[in-house]
């Protein structure tokens, strides 16, 4: 479970405070990027996770950044979260933030078929920019509170996640459903990936017993 302090740079949005005096210092920093098509609720998910606040009316995001210090699986972590633009006119910015990200929350809306089609393209772009066959990604079907308007079957989204080896969550920023869980799973995926990417430690040189010149007894 996540807990901790948060702050944000989004314009006209509530801000959190810094870490309290009793909070343990974070032992790691992760750069997380929230990506997806326009209007899928990326900002709503991010702000709900950062500040436990649902924003229903705001201008389309160009790019906002937030910081949250929290504990995931008992390990303090600083999360630098970039909430990105979904509008096509800002597409040129994508590769820049993709290069910097340690992990990606890939978001579509369950009531928007086109947004689901878009995540496949974004996933492919992430792997191309990173020049990897896999990378830490969590797939999120947002707006689960709009079940009656669903256009993307849960089974189809789950199959996408399974075939690409990424976790899938159906979430609702409005109801705060699976919001923390999705971000926490992304942190776990980043940790696992980084552990696998670390070069093996060089073997330590064997210690010689004794020292100095050999003694000769006369």
From Swiss-Prot:
Q: Where is this region: Disordered?
A: 1-30
Q: What's its job?
A: GTP-binding protein with GTPase activity, likely involved in the regulation of MAPK signaling pathway and thereby controlling multiple cellular processes. Regulates the organization of the actin cytoskeleton. With OSPBL3, modulates integrin beta-1 (ITGB1) activity.
Residue numbers covered by the propeptide annotation in the UniProt entry = 216-218
Q: How does it sit in the membrane?
A: Lipid-anchor
Ranges of compositional bias, category Gly residues: 7-20
What name has this protein been given in UniProt? Ras-related protein R-Ras
Q: Name one GO cellular component term.
A: plasma membrane
Q: Give the highest taxon in the source lineage.
A: Eukaryota
Q: Name one GO biological process term.
A: regulation of phosphatidylinositol 3-kinase/protein kinase B signal transduction
What reaction does this enzyme carry out catalytically?
A: GTP + H2O = GDP + phosphate + H(+)
Q: So what EC number does this one have?
A: 3.6.5.2
* S-geranylgeranyl cysteine lipid sites: 215
């Amino acid at each position: 479970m996540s807990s901790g302090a948060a702050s944000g740079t989004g314009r006209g949005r509530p801000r959190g405070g810094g870490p309290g005096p009793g909070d343990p210092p974070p032992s790691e920093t992760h750069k997380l990027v929230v990506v997806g098509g326009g209007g899928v609720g990326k900002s709503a998910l991010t702000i709900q996770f950062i500040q436990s606040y649902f924003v229903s009316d705001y201008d389309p995001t160009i790019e906002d950044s937030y910081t949250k210090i929290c504990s995931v699986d008992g390990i303090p972590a600083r999360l630098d979260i970039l909430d990105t633009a979904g509008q096509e006119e800002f597409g040129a910015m994508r590769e820049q933030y993709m290069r910097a990200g340690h992990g990606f929350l890939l978001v579509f809306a369950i009531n928007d078929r086109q947004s689901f089609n878009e995540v496949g393209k974004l996933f492919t772009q992430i792997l191309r920019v990173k020049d990897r066959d896999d990378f830490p990604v969590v797939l999120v079907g947002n707006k689960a509170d709009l079940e009656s308007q669903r256009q993307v079957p849960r089974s189809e989204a789950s199959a996408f996640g399974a075939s690409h080896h990424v976790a899938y969550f159906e979430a609702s920023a409005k109801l705060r459903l699976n919001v923390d869980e999705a971000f926490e799973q992304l942190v776990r995926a980043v940790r696992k990936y980084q552990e696998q990417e670390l070069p093996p430690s060089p073997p330590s040189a064997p210690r010689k017993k004794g020292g100095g010149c050999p003694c000769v007894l006369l």
